[in-house]
């Protein structure tokens, strides 16, 4: 089982005029995310499914990946919203998707949450050490859906500049 944890692209700055959940990707964010998606396609990455945070900037990032043909399906997964409980989110993921035939999933979300997911799956608990740049990617291999925390293996940690 492979998981690609993908942080949303560059978004509008935080502002009292725009609720956080409504912040959109900037033109630069869309362009960079598009180039990352093109590079993933060029190296043969294919997802069975893209799961995304409900926030607009993550939804837009996921849609760019879809439009590039990296997955046949996209679903909103509320456990990827910022600040959600990491162990509960991973349990929700396992419960919802373990019985499907998916072998490669993309999870589009936010920092520090995605880094915490990666650390929980590879080290058993969040360590606060990994950082995912905007439009950056962490790739993990899990031995099975039922593996305990700490059993995952990190195979990719790349900022977007290495992909564009």
UniProtKB/Swiss-Prot annotation:
Molecular function, one GO term: protein histidine phosphatase activity
Broad class of enzyme this protein falls into: hydrolase
Record keywords: Hydrolase
Keyword Ribosomal protein: no
Superkingdom in the source lineage: Bacteria
Gene3D superfamilies with a match to the protein in the record: Phosphoglycerate mutase-like
InterPro entries for this protein: His_Pase_superF_clade-1, His_PPase_superfam, Mito_Ser/Thr_phosphatase, SixA
GO cellular-component term (any): cytoplasm
Gene Ontology biological-process entries: protein modification process
Record SUPFAM superfamilies: Phosphoglycerate mutase-like
EC number(s) on file: 3.1.3.-
Cited NCBIfam families: sixA
Similarity annotation: Belongs to the SixA phosphatase family.
Stated name of the protein: Uncharacterized protein sll0400
């Amino acid at each position: 089982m492979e998981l690609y944890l993908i942080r949303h692209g560059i978004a509008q700055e935080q502002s009292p005029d725009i609720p956080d959940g409504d912040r959109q990707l900037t033109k630069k964010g869309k362009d960079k995310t598009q180039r990352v998606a093109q590079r993933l396609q060029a190296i043969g990455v294919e997802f069975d499914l893209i799961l995304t945070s409900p926030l607009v900037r993550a939804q837009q990032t996921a849609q760019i990946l879809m439009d590039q043909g990296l997955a046949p399906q996209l679903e909103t997964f509320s456990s990827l919203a910022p600040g959600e409980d990491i162990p509960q989110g991973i349990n929700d993921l396992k419960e919802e998707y373990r019985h499907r035939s998916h072998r490669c999933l993309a999870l589009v979300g936010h920092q520090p949450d995605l880094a915490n997911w990666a650390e929980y799956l590879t080290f058993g608990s969040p360590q606060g050490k990994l950082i995912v740049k905007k439009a950056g990617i962490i790739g993990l291999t899990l031995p099975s859906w039922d593996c305990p925390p700490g059993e995952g293996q990190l195979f990719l940690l790349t900022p977007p500049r290495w992909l564009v």
